[in-house]
């Protein structure tokens, strides 16, 4: 027994001896072993013994050194550049490197000992140790210096206890060593430096008014760029006298604006920027520096804090317009309809010019739901980037073309740390289908969330810590040092324009008043507000600094303030009689579109496509390149589709969709379809992107229809609903001529994005005069798949419907699906479309259409007749209208359940009428149809429970219609599942029993 126990011990001993052979040391060991093979005396005696004892052949040692075959190649990323390995803690390598360099210098006579003679071996070793310890200290500052930076203007933040890890003593340096020049190989822009010289640069760079976090970045080029940009004796925060005066001027404007409103509208909510005024010159710098580096457009998104100040001082919105709104006036002309919104939610756009570079700015309108505007801004920016390249591009726009449009997001500290959509947007930032060449995030960190202290609103030291997951550099900066804030904004902009990646500025400031101007903050933060009341404003502090520098006098500052106040007084007077001259919502890309009128007109648009064109598109849909290896199941799918095109019969759901997409692309409308697994389709029905089975190359038939067509993009999104839907909504705001679709994996999961439906899609047009043609495809249908795979909660969307705000449809034929998709682009206005889409109907033998139904004079039908009325070869022949005893109205898949059950029972006096579009409700069309059956009993049948589905919505509408036609039965009877808390049962037996019960109720 004892013998058997020895084996693991021996194995452990061997592992202990050889563990250094694994992973990252492989190259080094290989190199040593190769040297040993050539000449055993060329390596250290310990290594010589080790290699001799191994007695392995060279290949085995090499294999061991390389580690397992599944190890990720090129990872960890190899450090490149001088001494970068030191900064990642590979000290043995550094010591060797420095020793070699010092030996070389000694040999050339460049490095001298204390007596001025060439260095001895002992002195070289000491000098190398000094260098390594100095570099360890430099690394500590780069890693942890931000924790010691002077960031809090109020000085209330506790200093971290880091056990003096930044002190020279920690690295073996005593004051006696302070005069000695140490070789640091240009790490801080110096070849040699004393400890005090190093500390001077390090403290100024990492522990001043700016604290930089960048050592979590794994890309050596990005890391080296930041070091190069901020480290060194000549890299101080420095501005010209003109630059300093410009900063002062912007601060005076920002502070003066808030104070002016405070006097004129005492106690009115404005969510002032008081305490964070440095934001304004920082934003100016972002636009200015960006413009110099090729930036053409900035899409802003921000919360309420400081919004009016940004609108007026950065966006150039006339002050008179803002004062008009404070007075209670509308921001649109009187003849423009809309419910409006509070002034600190409104958007705006303008052009700014710096140094001859014109940059267009647009601020996106947003609700009070914090951070939800972020994905909308990113989507808008993506669409604008795409439009710069053109709609007929033949591939996704490369990343190098995207930096011309910058998404710029302003955040509150508590919201950035608290809202999940922030992490979702960061997750989108690097994905090919959603990247925007880097968003610039600016956190207005007033160190409080309404009344909650940071310790209770986040678990991490900084609000920005969530951004570390995507390795974004983070610049923490003291808001009371405007020059530092502007410098941080400049470097952040340069990083984004250089590397096309997100970057974060975290400006520590404070909120001089309460959460809003009617709030008393001392109830909950007495000490903080005591400090704030005693604290000078940023303008006072910066003014004193410039006076001390002799740049301005107090009289100059007083005059600047008086001039600004006079300008605001003039604007205030003008605001009393101000009239907005036009609504801006149909400018730019939206030119040529109009607002929709009468909700009940047909508004079909010309959606039919000639059969010849459809067949040409269909032919291309089933063609693949000769050398492309298609999966055999997909080949069968393509063969079936080719047969449909040949005969013009049996067009299924996915084929109708591809024909709609293809015909729109040929007509110049780009298609952007996004969502989880949309390339293939959740139910393996779509297959618009084909994969070669031998090399995984992609082929997209829809992008190979004809020259000059618009692009089709199918984007398998990340596993998120909220950010992705918000993003696609934003995209639809910027390009009205692109068909933008978001598909939920199942409709049940769409409520993960409920905020986007409630705050943007259903109400954006009425609140902010912003139209959208976004299509939401929500798979819906009760098939025994349980409570989370049955219901898109149709009732929720219907409850949101009013004032012709959007369309809700539940269509049953591929032809109607084809027309409703094309209708989105073929009218001169835009409305969102919420569609319940099928699952089992995707392959249902009856849910098919013909090419004839997509062409000629065909169009979308809001109501569809009973198939038995027209199809002579159907199983039953219906009675004449006068003999029909009951009309069963329904919507969606349940029609086919009713149809088959009726056929099975041989019933011929029950008429099935489908309501394909539930909103806008087709009242006139229903009056026409139901007039045929005035005498009949009316039933509404649905598969959803009674408290769900369309019943509650449609019941009053149907009652109105029946009264209008003077029907015999003035009330509609309900047939469907009884009310339920959960949408559907998870038991197939129960599902079938419920189905049988309501079919009996409807048809019996």
Swiss-Prot record:
GO terms for molecular function: oxoglutarate dehydrogenase (succinyl-transferring) activity; thiamine pyrophosphate binding. It is an enzyme of class 1 (oxidoreductase). It comes from the Bacteria. Belongs to the alpha-ketoglutarate dehydrogenase family. The keyword Oxidoreductase applies. Homodimer. Part of the 2-oxoglutarate dehydrogenase (OGDH) complex composed of E1 (2-oxoglutarate dehydrogenase), E2 (dihydrolipoamide succinyltransferase) and E3 (dihydrolipoamide dehydrogenase); the complex contains multiple copies of the three enzymatic components (E1, E2 and E3). One of its GO terms (cellular component) is cytosol. NCBIfam families: 2oxo_dh_E1 (TIGR00239), PRK09404.1 (NF006914), PRK12270.1 (NF008907). InterPro entries: 2-oxogl_dehyd_N, 2oxoglutarate_DH_E1, 2oxoglutarate_DH_E1_bac, DH_E1, KGD_C_sf, ODO-1/KGD_C, THDP-binding, Transketolase-like_Pyr-bd. Its cofactor is thiamine diphosphate. It comes from Brucella suis (strain ATCC 23445 / NCTC 10510). Keywords: Glycolysis, Oxidoreductase, Thiamine pyrophosphate. It catalyses: N(6)-[(R)-lipoyl]-L-lysyl-[protein] + 2-oxoglutarate + H(+) = N(6)-[(R)-S(8)-succinyldihydrolipoyl]-L-lysyl-[protein] + CO2. Its EC number is 1.2.4.2. SMART domains: Transket_pyr. The keyword Oxidoreductase applies. This is 2-oxoglutarate dehydrogenase E1 component.
């Amino acid at each position: 027994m004892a013998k058997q126990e020895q084996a693991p011990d021996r194995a452990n001993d061997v592992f202990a001896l050889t563990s250094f052979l694994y992973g990252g040391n492989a190259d080094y060991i290989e190199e040593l072993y190769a040297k040993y093979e050539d000449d055993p005396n060329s390596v250290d005696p310990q290594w010589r013994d080790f290699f001799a004892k191994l007695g392995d052949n060279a290949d085995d040692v090499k294999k061991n050194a390389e580690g397992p075959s599944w190890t990720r190649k090129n990872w960890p990323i190899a450090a490149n550049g001088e001494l970068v390995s030191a900064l990642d803690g590979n000290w043995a390598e550094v010591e060797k490197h420095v020793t070699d360099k010092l030996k070389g210098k000694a040999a050339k006579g460049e490095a001298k000992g204390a007596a001025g003679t060439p260095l001895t071996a002992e002195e070289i070793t000491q000098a190398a140790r000094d260098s390594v310890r100095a570099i360890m200290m430099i690394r500590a500052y780069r890693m942890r210096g931000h924790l010691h930076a002077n960031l809090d203007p109020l000085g209330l933040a506790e200093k971290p206890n880091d056990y003096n890890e930044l002190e020279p003593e920690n690295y073996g340096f005593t004051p006696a060593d302070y005069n000695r020049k140490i070789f640091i190989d240009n790490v801080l822009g110096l070849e040699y430096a004393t400890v005090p010289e190093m500390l001077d640069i390090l403290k100024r760079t990492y522990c001043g008014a700016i604290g930089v976090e960048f050592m979590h970045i794994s890309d050596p080029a990005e890391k080296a760029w930041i070091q190069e940009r901020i480290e060194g004796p000549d890299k101080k925060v420095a501005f010209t006298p003109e630059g300093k005066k410009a900063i002062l001027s912007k601060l005076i404007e920002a502070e003066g604006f808030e104070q002016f409103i405070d006097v004129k509208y005492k106690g009115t909510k404005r969510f002032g920027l008081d305490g964070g005024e440095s934001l304004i010159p920082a934003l100016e710098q972002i636009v200015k520096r960006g413009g110099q580096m090729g930036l053409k457009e900035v899409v802003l998104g921000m919360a309420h804090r400081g919004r009016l100040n940004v609108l007026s001082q950065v966006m150039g919105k006339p002050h008179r317009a803002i004062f008009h709104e404070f007075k209670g006036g509308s921001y649109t002309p009187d003849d423009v309809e809309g419910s409006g919104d509070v002034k600190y939610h409104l958007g705006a756009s303008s052009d700014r010019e710096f140094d001859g570079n014109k940059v267009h700015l647009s601020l996106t309108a947003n609700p009070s739901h914090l951070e939800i505007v972020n994905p909308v801004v990113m989507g808008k920016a993506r669409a604008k980037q795409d439009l710069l390249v053109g709609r007929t591009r033949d591939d996704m726009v490369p990343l190098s073309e995207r930096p011309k449009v910058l998404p710029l997001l302003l955040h509150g500290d508590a919201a950035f740390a608290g809202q999940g959509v922030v992490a979702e947007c960061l997750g989108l930032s690097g994905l090919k289908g959603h990247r925007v060449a880097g968003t610039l995030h600016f956190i207005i960190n007033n160190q409080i969330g309404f009344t909650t202290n940071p310790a209770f609103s986040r678990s991490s030291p900084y609000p920005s810590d969530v951004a570390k997951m995507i390795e974004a550099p983070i610049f923490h900066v003291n808001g009371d040092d405007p020059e530092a804030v502007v410098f941080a904004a400049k470097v952040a902009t340069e990083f984004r324009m250089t590397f096309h990646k997100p970057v974060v500025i975290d400006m520590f400031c404070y909120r001089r008043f309460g959460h809003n101007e009617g709030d008393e903050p001392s109830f909950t933060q007495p000490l903080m507000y005591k400090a704030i009341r005693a604290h000078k404003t940023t303008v006072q502090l910066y003014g004193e600094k410039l006076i001390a520098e002799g740049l301005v006098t107090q009289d100059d500052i007083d005059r600047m303030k008086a001039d600004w106040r006079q300008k605001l007084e003039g604007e205030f007077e003008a605001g009393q009689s101000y009239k907005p001259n036009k609504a801006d919502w149909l400018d730019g890309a939206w030119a040529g579109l109009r607002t929709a009128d009468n909700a009940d007109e047909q508004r079909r648009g010309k959606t039919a496509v000639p059969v010849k064109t459809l067949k040409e598109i269909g032919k291309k849909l089933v063609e693949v390149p000769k050398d492309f290896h298609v999966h055999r199941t997909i080949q069968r799918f393509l063969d079936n589709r080719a047969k449909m095109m040949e005969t013009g019969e049996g067009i299924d759901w996915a084929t109708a969709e591809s024909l709609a997409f293809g015909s729109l692309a040929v007509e110049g409308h780009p298609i952007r379809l996004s969502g989880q697994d949309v390339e293939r389709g959740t139910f393996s029905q779509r297959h618009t992107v084909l994969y070669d089975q031998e090399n995984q190359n992609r082929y997209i038939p829809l992008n190979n229809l004809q020259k000059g067509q618009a692009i089709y993009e199918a984007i398998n999104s990340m596993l998120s609903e909220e950010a992705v839907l918000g993003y696609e909504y934003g995209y639809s705001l910027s390009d009205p001529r692109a068909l933008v679709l978001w598909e939920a994996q199942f409709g049940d999961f769409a409520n993960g994005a409920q905020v986007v439906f409630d705050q943007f899609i259903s109400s954006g047009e009425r609140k902010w005069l912003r139209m959208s043609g976004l299509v939401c495809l929500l798979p819906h249908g009760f098939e025994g798949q349980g409570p989370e795979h049955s219901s898109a909660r149709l009732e929720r969307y219907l409850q949101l419907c009013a004032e012709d705000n959007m369309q809700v449809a539940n269509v049953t034929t591929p032809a109607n699906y084809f027309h409703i998709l094309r209708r989105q682009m073929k009218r001169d206005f835009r409305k969102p479309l919420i569609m319940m889409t099928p699952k089992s109907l995707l392959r249902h033998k009856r849910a098919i259409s013909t090419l004839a139904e997509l062409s000629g004079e065909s169009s979308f039908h809001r109501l569809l007749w009973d198939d038995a009325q027209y199809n002579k070869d159907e199983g039953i022949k219906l009675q004449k209208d006068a003999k029909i005893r009951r009309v069963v109205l329904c919507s969606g898949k349940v029609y086919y359940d009713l149809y088959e059950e009726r056929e099975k029972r041989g019933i011929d006096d029950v008429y099935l009428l489908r309501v394909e579009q539930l909103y806008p409700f087709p009242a006139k069309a229903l009056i026409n149809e139901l007039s045929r059956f005035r005498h009949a009993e009316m039933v509404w049948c649905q598969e959803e429970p009674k408290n769900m589905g369309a019943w509650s919505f449609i019941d009053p509408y149907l009652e109105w219609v029946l009264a209008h036609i003077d029907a015999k039965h003035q009330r509609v009877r309900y047939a469907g599942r009884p009310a339920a808390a959960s949408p559907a049962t998870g038991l197939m037996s129960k599902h079938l029993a419920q189905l049988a019960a309501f079919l009996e109720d409807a048809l019996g």
